[in-house]
């Protein structure tokens, strides 16, 4: 009788604890994974929650959130965000190397550049053509009208290869007129005797100017070498290096 009474009392207690229809958790949200329709289910039904495989949230593989492999967000490989594989490619690219402009190339071939194929000759800087009077009105007018056809740069070798100014100027005039004549003749333009006479005068003045410029630079370089090779200067430089290193 005692056992029957305990069993009956337990059955009545369970009946009182059963939820009534229409209350909480009846058809609403169930956890985990109950089969009632609707509501948010976890796992793995499609819904909207944090970390779900098919929903829309943070870190989901198919939803729309941050870092998702198929959704739309920042850094996704298939979505439409920054750096994503799909859509427009907003990937970073290495900056293209700057192209060398003609201005920089011209600067590299400035005054003092060794000219290939001329046996060590260098091409001087462009100069203004000197105003020269030839002694008669016809030649003066002819020069003013044709001076643009004459060289404005000279070819020369280093001044230390010549014993005096005359040798430098003579060689400078010959090679400059020869090169200018050959180049101009190749273009279909010929020079008359008057042109050659005027070119010789013009180029001679330019070669003298080039010699003076190169001589001054040469002596300045020599003075600098003598200054830095003197024992007191060497001792001073060594002392400064010792102070810096020490």
Swiss-Prot record:
InterPro entries: Prion, Prion/Doppel_b-ribbon_dom_sf, Prion/Doppel_prot_b-ribbon_dom, Prion_copper_b_octapeptide, Prion_N
Keywords, sorted A to Z: Amyloid, Cell membrane, Copper, Disulfide bond, Glycoprotein, Golgi apparatus, GPI-anchor, Lipoprotein, Membrane, Metal-binding, Prion, Repeat, Signal, Zinc
Gene3D superfamilies given in the database record: Prion/Doppel protein, beta-ribbon domain (1.10.790.10)
Region forming the signal peptide: 1-15
Annotated positions binding Cu(2+) 3: 70-72
Lipidation (GPI-anchor amidated serine): 223
UniProt GO BP: protein homooligomerization
Residues reported to bind Cu(2+) 1: 54-56
Glycosylation sites: 174, 190
Biased composition (Gly residues): 45-88
SUPFAM superfamilies, sorted: Prion-like
Localization in the cell: Cell membrane; Golgi apparatus
Region of interest (5 X 8 AA tandem repeats of P-H-G-G-G-W-G-Q), ranges: 44-84
Amino acid composition bias (Basic residues), ranges on this chain: 91-102
Subunit structure: Monomer and homodimer. Has a tendency to aggregate into amyloid fibrils containing a cross-beta spine, formed by a steric zipper of superposed beta-strands. Soluble oligomers may represent an intermediate stage on the path to fibril formation. Copper binding may promote oligomerization. Interacts with GRB2, APP, ERI3/PRNPIP and SYN1. Mislocalized cytosolically exposed PrP interacts with MGRN1; this interaction alters MGRN1 subcellular location and causes lysosomal enlargement. Interacts with KIAA1191.
Annotated protein name in UniProt: Major prion protein
Organism: Cercocebus atys (Sooty mangabey)
Origin organism lineage: Eukaryota, Metazoa, Chordata, Craniata, Vertebrata
